[in-house]
Amino acid sequence: MSNTTTARLLSAALLLSVSAAQAQDALLTKAKAYVVSATAPVTKCNGPTTGPKAAAGKSVIYISGDGNNGGITGVAAGVKEAAGVIGWTYRQIDGRGTVAGHSTAMGQAIALKPSAIVVGGFDAAEQADLITQADKAGIVVVAWHAGPQSGPIATPKIFTNVTTPIESTATAAAYYAIANSDGKAGVVVFTDSTARIAMAKANAMADIIKTCKTCTLLEIRNQAIAGAIPAMPQVTSSLLQKYGNKWNYSLAINDIYFDGMVPALSAAGIKPTGQLINISAGDGSISAYQRIRDGQYQDATIPEPLNLQGWQLVDEINRALAGQKPSNYSIPVHLVTKANINADGGDKNLFDPQNNYRAEYRKIWGK
């Protein structure tokens, strides 16, 4: 090989190296800017400002996918509160975290002939036949976390599905890991393959971590949410043996994984802060807020505005009853860390934006 050819190859390699470094610097800058935006106070109400006045004498049944899940019960509280304001009767049925339980709850709700049913936290495809039965009976069906995307679901027919876009949630969690580690995160992603929204969120987080050339995606670990707390000690011990110090960041689709992980981390001598950074891309449970506030094995969570989403579900039902289209409202993603944990309802261990959303919905409904 001639000296000229060698020089050209070295020059090309150098250019590639410089280009890769520039791309990595750009990613870090973007990630850090995104984190700043996602942790900012939420003071502006960017939801709907017009809509139909309140329909009179209506009833709504909230089917809780699992009465032990903090996110599901938080939305239920919002639906109940908003139903009281708009003047409707409210009832809740617990699906008890199983497919059979969801089926039983759906059947009971349909038999009661309410004006509307809220599918609260389980996949619409799982109960397609019963949702279709409700629609044919003239019952409005809306949902929270019944599919991977917000907005109407065509099959089975759901007027609208309320959820924070998974792309936004995944981006906030993954970018926090990239920014906080300065591009050196070794990541395990925890998800539940039984739910489409969980898998979509996990895959989106994994794809973003892969764009960080100096980060490492160690594994996407499947563990059902329903059995996460008793299973996670053994799962955690196994992962620590497998990866050791290479595992320094966790991205989970729900805080509940960290509820079960803490005992194993403590027993293994893992420091509560700085050694294994745990980030949840969803839920914002009370225990997660407490861990973040106390610096105990969790750095961040991405809570949804559960009470606000409950109010939105009631508003969406009211739009459906009036023959109008869904509002297609979705609040921007919000990242909670120790630095901002006491803002926007965080002092009460929840994300409740201080943007007067209750007053805005009352104005729309004439209440």
Where are the regions a protein language model picked out?
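Gram-negative bacterial Sec-dependent N-terminal signal peptides
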Residues: 1-23
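A residue-level marker of the well-folded mature domains of exported/periplasmic proteins
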Residues: 18, 23-367
